UniProtKB/Swiss-Prot annotation:
GO MF annotation terms: structural constituent of ribosome
PROSITE patterns linked to this entry: RIBOSOMAL_S21
Organism lineage string: Bacteria, Pseudomonadati, Pseudomonadota, Alphaproteobacteria, Rhodobacterales
GO biological process, one term: translation
Protein name: Small ribosomal subunit protein bS21
Species this chain originates from: Ruegeria sp. (strain TM1040)
Key words, A-Z: Ribonucleoprotein, Ribosomal protein
Length: 68
């Protein structure tokens, strides 16, 4: 990953780098890789995430259609 530093503004470059890493999911992946996750736990986590995403999508769709 590459970030350009303009006008010796390192703070701004660091913020841009953090934002890029966050978007790519690097921090989340690092957190998950810190400890071994059993396959059954991984499956349960992924299923819960999918349910969460579906609920969020349904909520947004209902709000767009004016139901909420």
């Amino acid at each position: 990953m590459q970030v350009s530093v303009r006008d010796n503004n390192v703070d701004q470059a660091l913020r841009a780098l953090k934002k890029k890493l966050q978007r790519e999911g690097v921090f989340r992946e690092m957190k998950l890789k810190q400890h071994f996750e059993k396959p059954s736990e991984k499956k349960a986590r992924e299923k819960a995430e999918a349910i969460r995403r579906a609920r969020k999508l349904a909520r947004k769709k209902a709000q767009r259609e004016g139901l909420l």
